[in-house]
């Protein structure tokens, strides 16, 4: 994979990797050219293996569209969906946050968090989910590693297993997530593990377990 995607985004450091792809800290060279003091973004690109899966680019676009549909202070901001013509790899650009994920915080605090601190996480997270559900979007994979805690507050991210309710984003193709079967044991609602459809209750389950 080239070090610069679409002639604009220079990959600098791997931030994390999952089943669909990897997330990098990247520099937006166009923003740098125009003297933007903060030219850094997060960039998620499909892995070489997953890029060969049918509908892989469409699944990534679905994640982008679902997240972009939500304009909420506690949902990670999406910027663009693009395809690099050299390596034919789809990617999305998004807000880069400084901080740690909730699972990293919990690893540092094995005895748990006091309610005073926990409520500052749980309340904005539930508010983000309530907003998403009201806008017809289901997250599908609520877990600590998909919650970022930073100086600018909490952000829910990674709608890769998300879905739009009927009538929401009608132009978005209905794609099956069955083949990636990425529900997280311990956070996935029992009905998801039984193969039942995703519902808002499954997102709430991921918060309370």
Residue ranges and their predicted role:
Residues 47-69:
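AlphaC helix of the eukaryotic protein kinase fold
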Residues 77-90:
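Short beta-strand micro-motifs within the conserved protein kinase catalytic domain, predominantly
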Residues 87-101:
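Conserved short submotifs of the Hanks-type protein kinase catalytic core
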Residues 102-113:
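AlphaC helix of the protein kinase catalytic domain
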Residues 121-122:
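Activation segment signature within eukaryotic-like protein kinase domains
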Residues 127-137:
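Protein kinase catalytic-loop region centered on the HRD/HxD motif
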Residues 161-163:
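Activation segment
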Residues 175-191:
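Conserved activation segment of eukaryotic-like protein kinases, specifically the C-terminal portion
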């Amino acid at each position: 994979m080239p070090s610069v995607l679409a002639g604009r985004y220079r990959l600098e450091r791997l931030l994390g990797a999952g089943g669909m792809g990897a997330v990098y800290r990247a520099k937006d060279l166009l923003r740098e050219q125009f003297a933007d003091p903060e030219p850094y973004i997060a960039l998620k690109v499909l892995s070489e293996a997953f890029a060969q899966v049918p509908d892989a680019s469409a699944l990534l676009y679905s994640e982008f569209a679902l997240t972009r549909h939500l304009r909420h202070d506690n949902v990670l901001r999406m910027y663009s969906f693009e395809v690099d013509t050299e390596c034919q790899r789809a990617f999305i650009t998004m807000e880069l946050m400084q901080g740690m994920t909730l699972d990293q915080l919990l690893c540092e605090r094995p005895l748990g968090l006091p309610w005073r601190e926990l409520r500052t996480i749980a309340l904005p997270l539930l508010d983000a989910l309530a907003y998403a559900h009201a806008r017809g979007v289901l997250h599908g994979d609520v877990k600590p590693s998909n919650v970022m805690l930073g100086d600018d507050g909490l952000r829910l991210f990674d709608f890769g297993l998300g879905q739009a309710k009927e009538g929401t984003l009608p132009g978005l193709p209905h794609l099956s997530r069955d083949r990636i079967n990425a529900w997280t044991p311990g956070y996935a609602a029992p009905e998801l593990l039984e193969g039942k459809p995703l519902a808002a209750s499954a997102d709430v389950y991921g918060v309370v377990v």
